[in-house]
């Protein structure tokens, strides 16, 4: 009987409280005690495990028959066959105590199951969510918004030219006359419309691209057909007008333009100096005979003596 009392006396101070047991709930220091430092906690656990081993050895040596119950087990209402010390609940509690010892200082003095602990845990999660971006793979996290490129790194775009109605009409008329401008024509057109040469050049490039898309293959046909007649002959004007209005869908070519045609002069108004070429060769069938009348075959001045 004394052996049973000794075993009960040794086992009583070494009992371990579970977080959901009656003793833990009724503990007056549940919400006020501070968490132990890791070194002290490790020493306490080592001492506790040593006492549990000694108590288990005494219980095994004094109680060979498993049907008998110890006074401590009777008082606590625990089955002697169930593992009192070293159970899974105890191991979980020890792991929780070790993890609680490594928490920040604000966890000290706060029990795990208390409302204060839940509030601290929620605050920690919120601060972690604000400090670290949510992973794109998690189902509950919103998709990270794609950040727009900074304005300093972006290449500045060229401002679009706003042409007036008069400028557009003049440019269209010029494009109908000719699709390719020379340097002088481009300069004169830009000065007359109060534009820059670059603006006129870019407008013509865009207009040619649009015309080629609307009329595929027409540009090469117009250039090949218009190369035969000379611009000074009447056939060139007629051919140009026919190609514009006939089979070729190119822009119409005006019949009389100052920079495309040459004025014709009668033969009587053309004056050639007599000393520029010999009149005998002109009279004998030279290439200038069609341009000279019979009155111009004689010199205009009397020969010097």
Curated annotation (Swiss-Prot):
Tissue-wise expression: Expression detected in the brain, testis and spleen. In the testis, expressed in the germ cells of the seminiferous epithelium, predominantly in elongating spermatids and spermatozoa. Expressed throughout the brain with highest levels in regions of the cerebral cortex, hippocampus, diencephalon, pons, medulla and cerebellum.
Biased composition regions of type Low complexity, renumbered to the chain: 129-140
Domain of life: Eukaryota
Segments of skewed composition (Basic and acidic residues): 97-115
Biased composition (Acidic residues): 87-96
InterPro entries noted in UniProt: HD, HD_metazoa, Homeobox_CS, Homeobox_NK-like, Homeodomain-like_sf
UniProt entry keywords in alphabetical sequence: Developmental protein, DNA-binding, Homeobox, Nucleus
Localisation per UniProt entry: Nucleus; Nucleus, Nucleolus
Protein name: NK1 transcription factor-related protein 2
Function of the molecule: Transcriptional repressor. May play a role in early development as a Wnt/beta-catenin effector, hence controlling pluripotency and preimplantation development of embryonic stem cells. May promote adipogenesis in mesenchymal stem cells, possibly by inhibiting the expression of the antiadipogenic factor NR2F2. May inhibit osteoblastogenic differentiation.
PROSITE patterns: HOMEOBOX_1, HOMEOBOX_2
Keyword Nucleus on entry: yes
Quaternary organization: Interacts (via the homeodomain) with HIPK1, HIPK2, and HIPK3.
GO MF entries: DNA binding; DNA-binding transcription factor activity, RNA polymerase II-specific
């Amino acid at each position: 009987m004394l052996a049973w009392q000794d075993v009960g006396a040794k086992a009583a101070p070494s009992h371990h409280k579970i977080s959901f047991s009656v003793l833990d709930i009724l503990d007056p220091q549940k919400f006020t005690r501070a968490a132990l430092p890791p070194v002290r906690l490790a020493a306490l656990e080592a001492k506790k495990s040593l006492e549990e081993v000694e108590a288990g050895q005494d219980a095994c040596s004094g109680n060979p028959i498993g049907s008998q119950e110890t006074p401590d087990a009777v008082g606590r209402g625990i089955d002697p066959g169930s593992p009192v010390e070293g159970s899974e609940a105890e191991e979980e509690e020890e792991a929780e105590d070790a993890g609680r010892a490594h928490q920040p200082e604000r966890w000290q003095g706060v029990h795990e199951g208390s409302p204060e602990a839940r509030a601290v845990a929620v605050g920690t999660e919120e601060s972690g969510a604000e400090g670290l971006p949510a992973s794109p793979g998690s189902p509950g996290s919103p998709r990270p918004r794609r950040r727009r490129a900074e304005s300093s790194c972006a290449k500045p775009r060229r401002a679009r030219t706003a042409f007036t109605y008069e400028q557009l009409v003049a440019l269209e008329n010029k494009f109908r006359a000719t699709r390719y401008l020379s340097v002088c024509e481009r300069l004169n057109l830009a000065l007359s419309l109060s534009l820059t040469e670059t603006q006129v050049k870019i407008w013509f490039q865009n207009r040619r691209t649009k015309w080629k898309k609307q009329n595929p293959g027409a540009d090469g046909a117009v250039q090949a057909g218009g190369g035969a007649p000379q611009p000074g002959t009447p056939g060139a004007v007629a051919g140009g007008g026919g190609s514009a209005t006939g089979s070729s869908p190119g822009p119409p070519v005006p019949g009389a333009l100052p920079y495309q045609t040459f004025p014709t002069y009668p033969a009587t108004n053309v004056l050639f100096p007599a000393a520029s070429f010999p009149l005998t060769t002109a009279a004998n069938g030279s290439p200038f005979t069609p341009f000279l009348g019979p009155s111009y075959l004689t010199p205009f001045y009397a020969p010097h003596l």
